[in-house]
Curated annotation (Swiss-Prot):
UniProt-annotated location(s): Cytoplasm
Pfam family, one: UDG
Name this protein carries in UniProt: Uracil-DNA glycosylase
KW DNA repair (keyword) present: yes
A GO cellular component entry from the record: cytoplasm
Amino acid sequence: MTDDDRIKLEPSWKAALRGEFDQPYMHQLREFLRGEYAAGKEIYPPGPLIFNALNSTPLGQVKVVILGQDPYHGPGQAHGLCFSVQPGVATPPSLVNIYKELQRDLNIPIPSHGYLQSWAEQGVLLLNTTMTVERANAASHAKKGWELFTDRIIQVVSEQCPNVVFLLWGAHAQSKQKLIDGTKHLVLKSVHPSPLSAYRGFIGCGHFSRTNSFLEQRGLGPIDWALPPL
């Protein structure tokens, strides 16, 4: 049995990514993670949620891709969806700014929580390009192999899905534009919603209304960006 037969992954993604789990980089990543766990380090998100973005948004249902960098590194925050936090956790500053732009753009009231699962279930792939992190140690799992895996995910979406909107916020996300076929998809770029940069172009970008206009023009249902109460 190959390694990818043991990975608990939504079937359409498992088929599309078949073979990735047997690549040398993935063996190296797996050994790195085993070593971190064996050393008693606390790794986020919890193991069953590492692939939550893929398991929540099957490949054939992807309408929008939002790219993050690595998971939140505070206790109880990360659950495998970029920018999102688990119920009961304070909304992080970048997500507060995303909500401010949603309110400005679409007049959507600012939610009382930061749990974006409903976006994922509507076809918004909330993908961190590094999928794990050590507690209180930002970017600790960068350049360990995850980026090769998530680059392949972006390529698969570009190749196999029609009419996807890619929202690339900040330089790191924009570095992935080369993986996307701009003749098939809509690529929208702005600065990152971080408090350090949000008011230099993220607030006012109109990405949410532009996303829905693009989807509706192609006969696809818009995203309901309003989050249900918890």
